[in-house]
């Protein structure tokens, strides 16, 4: 979509993501390092200048994020359940850090390489976690997401995806 907000079951929200992150993802689609029957032909149409222009344009769009994201210390651990509990506390018995350790408070994203999860479509988050589990997505830095995803149950994937999809954004 022209807004960059995507559509559930079709395309992720990419508005406001860092241009360098978007350019890297486009290059990964072009090289076959990320799998998508939809994105591969679109990426293949772009030359270097097209990748740069496309990435910069989507990066320039407003990214709807929580106005005042809750930091880990702002939440009472005893009150957290389901996907929010996993997102904020992880499960150290399984060497599974919290999602917000890397993705920031309420999944707002961090820097050039760690995308936002807040307000992202639940189906997209689920699909990506399942792809990392299955080894069909392998373009994460140092294999971190693949290793984390493999520790999640199907129920946990759904719960954490629903949590981030429902984070209230502006």
Map each language-model feature to its residues.
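Gly/Gly-Pro-rich "capping" loops immediately C-terminal to redox-active cysteine motifs
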Residues: 4-31, 40-46, 100, 104-134, ...
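Electrostatic cytochrome c docking/interface patches
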Residues: 5-10, 63-92, 110
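Extracytoplasmic c-type cytochrome modules immediately beyond a signal peptide or single-pass transmembrane anchor
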Residues: 19-76, 84-85
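C-terminal capping alpha-helices of c-type cytochrome domains
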Residues: 44-67, 82, 123, 150-170
């Amino acid at each position: 979509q022209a807004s960059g907000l995507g559509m559930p079951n079709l395309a992720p929200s990419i508005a406001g993501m860092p241009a360098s992150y978007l350019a890297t993802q486009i290059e990964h689609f072009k090289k076959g390092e990320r799998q998508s029957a939809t994105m591969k032909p679109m990426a293949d149409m772009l030359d270097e200048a097209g990748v740069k222009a496309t990435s910069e344009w989507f990066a320039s769009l407003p990214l709807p994020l929580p106005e005042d994201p809750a930091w880990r210390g702002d939440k009472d651990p005893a009150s957290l359940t389901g996907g929010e509990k996993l997102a904020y506390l992880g499960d150290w018995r399984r060497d599974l850090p919290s999602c917000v350790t890397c993705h920031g408070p309420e999944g707002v994203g961090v820097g050039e390489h760690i995308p936002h999860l807040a307000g992202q479509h639940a189906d997209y988050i689920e699909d990506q976690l399942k792809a990392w589990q299955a080894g069909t997505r392998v373009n994460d830095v140092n294999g971190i997401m693949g290793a984390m995803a493999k520790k999640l149950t199907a129920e946990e994937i759904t719960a954490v995806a629903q949590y981030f999809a429902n984070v209230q954004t502006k």
